[in-house]
């Protein structure tokens, strides 16, 4: 059995969690959650302890992203997946353009196409492992793409399409796995939305979005247009509740707490620049190793497209990546398997800010050892 191989302990990472999400949660933050005892968990989300926690998350995000004047931090339940439907109800007026370059970026396009009150979206697609670019288009009032395609480990720039303006069209960026680990200038985007279980080292179930003034206005305009919007998807309700440091319905309090702890750590460790420096160090280590390896190579061929926060590494046909992942898992190095629908002979490795760059280097040494002993 290959999973019976014992990797020498001096080669192993100190922490073996490399999953793309749910991702590594710092144990100190779990200890801090336990230490709250009876003061937070199990108390009303309409009272000060939980509302103060929501405020802590919102202010932490404002600090991390240097929130421009007029922008607001809005949050609600359901995760980033729910936000695609929220956007079809409350942000797209008539027609959207979508960049699709993997499983998750394509899902928003499918949601827009399925909405009978919207015109069929414009879709610009590229093969997995590469990325397309947005193009100004008449009749489009929302441009949407992912900052980081989690399934393939391709990152895309966040730049407003040339020839467009927030006066007539919004830029909606799915930053689920990129926010907090990739650089961004929020002045280039109207809604930058994400979830806590990636760079923010928490659990899932919430969506968080940074809204520009134009996006806030659009949400109000669409809501007033007479379009039927289910209460759970109503953005003005979420915006109003968020301004009061609460959510429309009961949030996952532990998720908020772990995110707040991570935000405190991020802001105390150099802010967004410090986090990008961490993910850059980790990804440089991974890709340099793969480029020098006799049996592995980066799946994403263009270095400019390679993600800082997720790495996909292909293996030569003679090496079974699934067997490598199985041995790693048996040795406590977990969740390096590739995205299931991509169907590649590869490993997928998360390098979010909570992951120590030294552990990424140790992972490469462990992989080399496993391949040598298969």
UniProtKB/Swiss-Prot annotation:
It is found in: Cytoplasm. It catalyses: O-phospho-L-serine + 2-oxoglutarate = 3-phosphooxypyruvate + L-glutamate; 4-(phosphooxy)-L-threonine + 2-oxoglutarate = (R)-3-hydroxy-2-oxo-4-phosphooxybutanoate + L-glutamate. Its EC number is 2.6.1.52. Disulfide bonds: none annotated. GO terms for biological process: glycine biosynthetic process, by transamination of glyoxylate; L-serine biosynthetic process; pyridoxine biosynthetic process. GO terms for cellular component: cytoplasm. Belongs to the class-V pyridoxal-phosphate-dependent aminotransferase family. SerC subfamily. This is Phosphoserine aminotransferase.
């Amino acid at each position: 059995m290959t999973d019976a191989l014992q990797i020498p302990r001096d080669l192993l990472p100190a922490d073996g969690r490399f999953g793309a999400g749910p991702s590594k949660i710092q144990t100190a933050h779990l200890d801090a959650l336990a230490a709250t005892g009876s003061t937070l968990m199990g108390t009303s989300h309409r009272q000060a302890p939980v509302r103060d926690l929501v405020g802590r998350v919102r202010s932490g995000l404002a600090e991390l992203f240097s929130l421009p004047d007029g922008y607001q931090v809005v949050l609600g339940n359901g995760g980033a997946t729910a936000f695609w439907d929220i956007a079809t109800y409350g942000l797209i007026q008539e027609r959207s353009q979508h960049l699709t370059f993997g499983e998750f970026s394509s899902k928003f396009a499918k949601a827009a196409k399925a909405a009978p009150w919207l015109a069929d979206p414009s879709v610009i697609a590229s093969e997995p492992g590469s990325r397309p670019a947005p193009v100004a288009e008449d009749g489009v009032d929302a441009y949407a793409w992912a900052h980081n395609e989690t399934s393939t480990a391709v990152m895309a720039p966040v730049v407003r399409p040339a020839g467009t303006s927030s006066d007539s069209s919004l830029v909606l960026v799915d930053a689920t796995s990129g926010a907090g680990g990739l650089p961004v200038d929020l002045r280039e985007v109207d809604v930058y939305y994400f979830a806590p279980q990636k760079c923010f080292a928490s659990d899932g179930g919430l969506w968080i979005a940074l809204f520009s003034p134009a996006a806030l206005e659009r949400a109000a305009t669409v809501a007033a247009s007479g379009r039927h919007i289910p209460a759970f998807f109503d953005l003005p309700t979420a915006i109003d509740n968020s301004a009061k440091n609460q959510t429309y319905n009961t949030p996952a309090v532990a998720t908020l707490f772990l995110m707040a702890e991570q935000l405190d750590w991020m802001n105390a460790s150099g802010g967004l620049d410090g986090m990008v420096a961490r993910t850059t160090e980790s990804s440089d280590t991974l890709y340099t190793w793969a480029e020098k390896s006799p049996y592995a190579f980066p799946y994403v061929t263009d270095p400019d497209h390679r993600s800082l926060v997720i790495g996909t590494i292909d293996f030569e046909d003679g090496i079974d990546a699934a067997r490598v992942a199985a041995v790693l898992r048996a040795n406590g190095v977990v969740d390096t398997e590739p995205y299931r629908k991509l169907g590649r002979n590869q490993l997928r490795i998360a390098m979010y800010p909570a992951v120590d760059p030294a552990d990424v280097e140790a992972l490469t040494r462990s992989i080399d050892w496993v391949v040598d002993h298969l």
